[in-house]
A protein has these predicted regions:
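Alpha-helical transmembrane segments in inner-membrane proteins
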Residues: 1-333
């Protein structure tokens, strides 16, 4: 199964580089890549080379990073909270990032500085929301997963109401810009944004994957896990910090992209079973492939215009999620 997912990932990467308003053959792209290593000669024009390496490649890499982080964070949350409906935005990341981005677009930045301020304040807002959630619902030694989730719901409601207030006092153009950001997109991807996000994703995703064994133990219940010698609160803190930090970094750059973190772990679970030691690493690969394919659809189905990436993931994700729930219901009946 891991091999099949790897093949799907390679296919997604090639499609992301090949398909677009200007189609470029995969063999020519590979030839150009080898020519940069001093092997052979490129058959691409300078314009085609720029399209591939300055536009499509950073977009594809950012899609790989975002998809892998959202998927593994969703799987981790589903494990640590023992909630199959958990996603990476459970503890207020989406609401906090939305408030930060709205503040940047409406009040702080001008047209020239929006690309700088929006991801910065979105990241700060996301981490502030998660921190507040933990302070309210997670710092007590007696705190449970349910307490933390309820705190996340309350914090999300607070931040969302503040975001709505900001939007009500802003211009029509600012509201439109906020709306575009909230739907998510890789259109502004660059090598700079890739370099900003990659350390967060690599470290945080690795922590989540390594927590798989502990999540398997916690799946039997907190009390049982403690009786087996596991520090449940410490594991929960580390996992929540890693998942939230990685998600905040991704969301600050690409906006809010739904369904990746909830459906990918479910699909992987159907394929490989219920052990998080297998679910989490495969979710990294599957999530990366899924988001790159979704972005390819988003930028080509209405070319030269683009669909918001969040719309594409919702159109794909909602029916898939219904099918998954039906399969699980049939399995339990």
């Amino acid at each position: 199964m891991a091999v099949l997912i790897m093949v799907a990932l390679v296919v997604a990467v090639m499609l992301g580089l090949v398909i677009g308003p200007v189609s470029i053959a995969a063999t020519r792209i590979l030839g150009d890549a080898f020519s940069h290593l001093g092997i052979g000669h490129s058959t691409l024009t300078s314009t085609q080379s720029s399209i591939v390496w300055q536009l499509r490649a950073p977009r594809m890499v950012l899609g790989l990073l975002a998809g892998s982080m959202l998927a593994v964070a969703g799987g981790t949350y589903q494990g640590v909270f023992r909630n199959p409906l958990a996603d990476p935005y459970l503890l207020g990341v989406a609401a906090g990032a939305g408030l930060g981005a709205t503040l940047a677009i409406v009040d702080v930045a001008n047209a020239a500085t929006v690309p700088t301020w929006t991801p910065l304040l979105a990241f700060v807002g996301a981490m502030l929301a998660v921190t507040l959630t933990w302070v309210i619902g997670g710092r007590s030694m007696r705190s449970t997963a349910a307490t933390l989730v309820l705190a996340g719901v309350a914090v999300s409601a607070l931040f969302t109401s503040a975001q709505t207030f900001l939007q009500q006092r802003s211009s029509v153009q600012s509201i439109a810009n906020v709306y575009i950001w909230l739907l998510g997109s890789l259109a502004n991807a660059s090598w700079h944004s890739v370099l900003v996000v990659i350390p967060y994703v690599v470290v945080c995703a690795l922590v989540c994957v390594l927590a798989g064994r502990a999540l398997d133990v916690m799946s039997v219940g907190d009390d049982e896990a403690r009786s087996l010698g596991l520090s449940v609160r410490s594991v929960r803190l580390v996992v929540v910090v890693a998942s939230s930090l990685g998600t905040a970094a991704v969301v600050s750059v690409v906006g809010l992209i739904g369904f990746v973190g909830i459906i990918v772990p479910h699909i992987v679970r159907l394929l490989v079973g219920t052990s998080y030691r297998r679910i989490l690493p495969l979710s990294v690969l599957f999530g990366a492939a899924f988001l790159v394919l979704a972005d390819t659809v988003a930028r080509t189905v209405m070319a030269p215009s683009e669909l918001p990436l969040g719309v594409v993931t919702a159109v794909i994700g909602a029916p898939v999620f219904v099918v998954i729930l039906s399969v699980r219901r049939m399995g339990h009946s």
